[in-house]
Amino acid sequence: QLIMALQTIPSRRLSPQDSAVVSITQINGGEAINVLPDTVVLRGTFRCLSNRVRARVRELIESYVATQPQVSDVQGEISWFPGYPVTKNHALQAQQVREVAAATLGAQAVRWNQAPSMASEDFACMLEACPGAYFWIGTDGETPSKPLHNASYDFNDALIGPGVAMWVGLVEKQLPAA
């Protein structure tokens, strides 16, 4: 019941304009198939597109866990591990990435104003400390490849040149000519 309740937070407790994902990714409890375990450990993640929604989701998770004893005679406690903040690009740096990408890879290769992603990214910490922009270089070749974070993922070596060219272009744009 708790898992189902937690996963309905985005659809039932948030505004449709407030994107969020709640995922229970591990359930561990007991060793024997015919004995109810004393404890069960649930682990998971949640991701949002704003710090306001992040705080609300955390509040709702705490509320759901706190009310479980009333519903199913179980006790719950939460151990929070710091996740990454929301990844938010700065406008000027994002525009510079767009310009360099168009000049380096060709305007047809640049996809701008894509829908926000629920990816979790440690680069978000850098963006909180200083202006910058996070961007993706697509990994597909002529045919779609396995997605990142997949055991079958195989890096497309043909991307090394375009990737290096992007970084060189960004460095040249940022540093004055000597």
PLM regions and their residue ranges:
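Metal-dependent amide/peptide-bond hydrolase catalytic core
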Residues: 3-178
